[in-house]
Amino acid sequence: RSGHLGLWKALRSPHVDFFVSPYTYAFRGVGGDGLPMQPTESLRVHGKLYLFEEDTLMHNNFDPGGRMHPVEKSIPIYQRHFAQVATHGLGITWLENNIYAESPLIVDESRRWHRRFQELGEWALRLDRTPAAEVAVFLDDESFRYESFRNNIDIPLIWHQRVLSLNRFGAPHDLYLLNDLLEGRLPEY
């Protein structure tokens, strides 16, 4: 729901190199954002790679009319997600397989953009990848133990602030686990 129970332990493991998750399920459509589920800057300071699973295709296939938006609007969604991963130093996986194939309406344009994303991604790897956020925001991966199963306070105080407000408050931000601050792992802000 709002915590990442046990993430701190996994980040400290020498046996884990990367994490994969889809982007948040809220605000997936046009006008939304591509917010990763994990506190990606914590992964970075621990030397782990975050792979952003771009699964718009799968969700649009659940509802032929497009669960989040018309299929024709998928390209701007893909562009938004590429911008998210390129500006935050993340990896990305594009979900397309024999079960979930790209719509015939946009298949040629989609393939053209995926090639362009690959070119831009390879170029971006040569750039300075130092985060340039102005604000650090902290999550406590153990806070879930103290939350209720009711949505009376957890949703407005945790989920809404993180998912609704952070990407719209006007300053670039990095998202960390609280333990990163307590252990002195953060850059200067």
Write out the residue ranges for each language-model feature.
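Short, well-structured alpha-helical segments in soluble
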Residues: 7-12
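Carbohydrate-binding surfaces of carbohydrate-active enzymes
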Residues: 13-189
